[in-house]
Curated annotation (Swiss-Prot):
This is ATP synthase subunit alpha, mitochondrial. The gene is ATPA. Its main location: mitochondrion. Keywords: ATP synthesis, ATP-binding, CF(1), Hydrogen ion transport, Ion transport, Membrane, Mitochondrion, Mitochondrion inner membrane, Nucleotide-binding, Transport. Belongs to the ATPase alpha/beta chains family. CDD domains: ATP-synt_F1_alpha_C (cd18113), ATP-synt_F1_alpha_N (cd18116), F1-ATPase_alpha_CD (cd01132).
Amino acid sequence: MEFSVRAAELTTLLESRITNFYTNFQVDEIGRVVSVGDGIARVYGLNEIQAGEMVEFASGVKGIALNLENENVGIVVFGSDTAIKEGDLVKRTGSIVDVPAGKAMLGRVVDALGVPIDGRGALSDHERRRVEVKAPGIIERKSVHEPMQTGLKAVDSLVPIGRGQRELIIGDRQTGKTAIAIDTILNQKQMNSRATSESETLYCVYVAIGQKRSTVAQLVQILSEANALEYSILVAATASDPAPLQFLAPYSGCAMGEYFRDNGMHALIIYDDLSKQAVAYRQMSLLLRRPPGREAFPGDVFYLHSRLLERAAKRSDQTGAGSLTALPVIETQAGDVSAYIPTNVISITDGQICLETELFYRGIRPAINVGLSVSRVGSAAQLKAMKQVCGSLKLELAQYREVAAFAQFGSDLDAATQALLNRGARLTEVLKQPQYAPLPIEKQILVIYAAVNGFCDRMPLDKIPQYERDILTTIKPELLQSLKGGLTSERKIELEKFLKEKGGTYYI
């Protein structure tokens, strides 16, 4: 039987075939899971993969390639590995890990991959930034010269922090490390409300690493009650999250903070705490069979923290003059600051605030050891008035600590030593401060001026907090505001007259 096809039919058939011809083929490089366990998957067949590249498993779980070996690739899994089976397909994504960044992130709580976990829906307008980028070069930087005020008298007077600095907060558990960090965020509320331009506003990023979910929820509540969430981003990799997410969270938070730094704005990032990140990285490295070193940490644990903290910088005027200030937190064991991770981070940062359990239990809060705490670059950023006021403060406190140790052995002390002990006790009392009550810088200057110049010397110690509240509420607002501009001789006369009048009722 013969078939005859007319030319017109043939043309129509060919046209429809050509029209429906699909050319957009996608070629994926695929590997197979050889073994999986403890959050680590060994994959065979991904020969062209890059270090740090994201991959996707058949179950939809993502991972990152960390170990590139001859036979297979070591991949750490971002999530539960229970859905991954031997022989499953693994697909390259062709992209390095990135996270959302921008002002749309403000007020949100996200996980280490930038996915919102606060139940307020998806993120709106935002850009994406790589998690691992190089720190700014030498030419792009400028020396730190603007103050980053914490609202804490002990910090702003003795260990001042500048915008673009890295200041370590180190101490045992339950010594108030997180309290200092939270007070710093709360203090920016009044600073930002006074800001006249975007370049004066300071945005905050808080990275919670390995903390309890209840602790993070409590922090969100504190910040929202103080209306501080509107200029803050929270990145949470809690204790129940896999180690890879705890390892990644600081880098994700840093990428979000860098958006502000690179666009001529200012940001503060708090890593709470980097000890837990190092432990998570140690776990991953040992499971990837990398050789262990001191305290079983891998050899590149210094680089883990240095490449993160070097990204906090003050940019030059040519590159926008933005800044990223870092406050990393490290937890010590029984006050041992000579352990591996503490010494590493101390050597990377521009100074440290040391907190001690003994001071905390003696009621000196914040429990800052003034002798061990130091700020290597912050004094250049300190306000002129604060410099004038607290010039002798550190010396007097050092002399007080030295004499107080000897005073325990004998009571027959000369008048000069008695005066030194008396002044030191009052200075220590003045530097105490309740939690969640940061003070504006002009109020700090007033209180410290009163203590350093002997206006509290004749008062009982228990009356000093009351005296402090009294002078802060009754001083003329214009005199208080003028203190930020420096202490001229006229202002000093006016200030001393006011302090003498107020002090009379409190003297013994």
